[in-house]
Amino acid sequence: MTGNDILLWDETLFKDLSVLEPDYLPEYFPHRDSQLNALRFALRPSLRGMRPLNCLLVGPPGTGKTSAVMKVFREVEVHAPGVVAVKVNCQIDSTRFAVISRIYRQLFGISPPNSGIAFRKLFETVVNFLVSSEKVLIVALDDLNYLCCEGHANEVMYSLLRAHEQYPGAKIGVIGIVNDASDLYCLDSRVNSVFLPEEISFLRYGEAEILDILKDRVKYGFYPKVISDDVLELVVSYVEKTGDLRVGIDLLRRSGFNAERRGSRTISSGDVEKAYEASKLLHLCRGISLLSDSEKQLLELIAKADDVKAGELYKSFHELTQLGYTRFYGMVNRLQTLNYVDADFTGKGKRGRTRIIKAKYEAEDILNCLKKG
């Protein structure tokens, strides 16, 4: 390393570190035009003071669902002062009271009383304000399946979707965000009959799309010539392995720190590999933590069994959970979609083709993540 290659103590590789933060919302949002336009169309009635169409955004983690909602919400805030758009993280706000409290805070700028107020009174305050001020409310329920896990999905959805029946003039639309439509198995007929969402699919990004998006982050996040095309291709390969674009953005950030720690003006492949080794379990564990208890139990059985036939796996799973084959089949497909398992048909079983299921990660890594919750 020559003198010109050495990064001085008061210098940095980052032109704008915020571009590489997980909550950064880029102006340029490539490869999601059809999804953005579908979402805009569904919300268009709210710009005219009408109740919008309900939506369900479906796709694996790291495919831009939440970012798409936040981008359109930002547009709504600029062009439609009569619309209130609220995003609720259902991992955090997982009860009916917590969801309405989040909406209350956005409407009034303060938190509701911690105790001594009933849900009905709180909800009435929110809806009466919307009616009297002639505002339309759009609620995005991010990770809506967590309300299912906690047993509150139906009461939350029913309260929001049927508010206009009890409070004439109330105009509320709901956007559900989930990894898989089967996550909403808990919704009953009362809710489904009024939810009737426009489903918007977010497929995994392809290799070229991942490269395009990461190039844009590199352009605005780093100074020129900090990362070469070859090193960026290595980052892309790790993103393809995990299926989560957020992994790539985090790797760029961590790799930059590694290069700075070495005092280098450029990011090396070693910086990327070191960053991935340090963070790979963080991303795996984060993803596993989002699974339902039953999905975690199934994944544990798969990890411990190595390669296992679907019939044998179902027998063990049913003994453990008492759940039926339909739920089991859906969970296997979901774990495959999330890139945790391979579940391919192979060979011949007693009654035709059989499915061999195996984990895509080291069993030890999966089990360690499951222990962490």
Swiss-Prot record:
Signal peptide as annotated in the record: none
Annotated binding of ATP, by residue: T63, G64, K65, T66, S67, Y205, R217
Membrane-crossing segments per the record: none
Claim: Membrane is one of the keywords in the record: no
GO molecular function: ATP binding; ATP hydrolysis activity
KW Transmembrane (keyword) present: no
InterPro entries for the chain: AAA+_ATPase (IPR003593), AAA_16 (IPR041664), Cdc6_C (IPR015163), Cdc6_lid (IPR055237), ORC1/CDC6 (IPR050311), Orc1/Cdc6_arc (IPR014277), P-loop_NTPase (IPR027417), WH-like_DNA-bd_sf (IPR036388)
CDD domains named among the record's database cross-references: HLD_clamp_RarA
GO BP: DNA replication
One Pfam match: AAA_16
UniProt KW keywords: ATP-binding, DNA replication, Nucleotide-binding
The family this protein is said to belong to: Belongs to the CDC6/cdc18 family.
Function description: Involved in regulation of DNA replication.
NCBIfam families: orc1/cdc6 family replication initiation protein, PRK00411.1-2, PRK00411.1-5
Name under which the protein is recorded: ORC1-type DNA replication protein 2
Originating species: Methanosarcina acetivorans (strain ATCC 35395 / DSM 2834 / JCM 12185 / C2A)
Gene: cdc6-2
